[in-house]
Amino acid sequence: MHELVIKGGRVALDDGWAECDIGIDDGRIAAIGNGLTGRALLDSGGRWVMPGGIDAHCHLDQPVWGGAGNADDFESGTISAAFGGTTCIVPFGMPGPDMTTIGAVDRALDRSTGRAVIDYGLHAVVTMGTGPDVEAQLTELAGRGIASVKLFMTYQGFAVDDDLFFRVLDTAHSLGWIVMVHAENDAAIRRTRQRLIDLGRTDIRYHVVAHSETMEREATHRALAFAEMTGARMTIVHVSSWQSAEEVARARVRGVDAIAETCPQYLFIGSADLDRPALDAARFVFSPPPRSPRSHEHLWQALIDGGIDLWSSDHSPYWFADKIGGSQTPAFNTTLSGIPGIETRLPLLFSEGLLTARLTLGRYLDLTSRNAASIYGLADRKGRIAVGLDADLALWDPTARWTLGHKALHSRVDFTPYEGKSVTGKPTTVLVRGVPVVADGQLQVQPGFGQFVERTAANPDLSGKPVEETTPWLDS
């Protein structure tokens, strides 16, 4: 007899749907089958039992860089994630000014402990200011359950030069880590922004001009060329454009271990939204910016055929007054870049991808949990409904029709770019390690229930080997 049995559900298994029970013991899935008995029963009532989602790209409680702080901390952010069907997140140990990479991770651990309601890991981040001993810092963090690092190719204070880029790639490769890259050409962005400002063209719609598809494509190509030279495994985060998606596809043909991530805003928000009146248009400012219908169509096809591997939120939460700097006529160059999305990530794809049969069940599971688990070193515990893994589950009502709006969501952010959008399908019960975190529309656990998850190297066969044994550009 199991501690808990979920009965009567349509269960999303690796090989398809099954009408079966799930037995849970000690927080893990102990059995999958029919006729299971348990000391406690959870009747799914015909709901769809899905793996809990994994969001491997979100921002919570980050240091302030001369602007506004995040509206969501690890408590409110993980509560919002849970109500959206997500059971594990991997945000960033983002450095503040004059903060080392290790110091940034320590800060994030300190501010998350006792606050999260779902499980979480952390990505490291390297900038030009995070210390000269980057190799030693990343190696130390590898022993503390970190298995990935992010680099920026733009943003003042964050963008790395080519030398540091290569040093991080070599180190990450030798550790078996994956490198996440924000790919936009910094010099082109700064040059174009200043020209637009000099010409007085600062309406919100010029955000697309200042962050063009060409700028994203060029940086994507260059980052993947660096990965090709070093043998490093690389995720291009928030792919927004058909051009960048094609760069990833070309790199794969050349043998680059290239992973592509996109986000809901690149399918459900378009560049035309920036043509709205300024206060309305400001809700849609994020970087890279929303793109054309051509990119929407291309990215949908990439979701379908495997060109895109990851569906992440890039949740970047600001209160709206902070986002627009208190201005009633916000400009593209003064509006903070970033939108909330940690709770709407799964409902949007469930409604518009899975229920419409645009996506197969397998592709939906790959995009929302399975790939993130395997890519980011969580597959030994999370990402699938399988015996031995954590009982991280979301029971979805596939008939529930509801309207997205910031008052219906659980983030502290006071706006959503999806205000008024109707979706079908809603997670009604969410379990983390077999414990209901959300049920009957209410939070069921206290802050601190969520645990930090130590991750393993995504490519452990390389871990611990010297760089000269693992780097292609030294083979010639």
Q: What residues fall within each predicted segment?
A:
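Histidine-rich, glycine-flanked metal-binding segment
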Residues: 1-52, 66
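Alpha-helix-loop-beta-strand connector modules within alpha/beta enzyme cores
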Residues: 102-118, 167-181
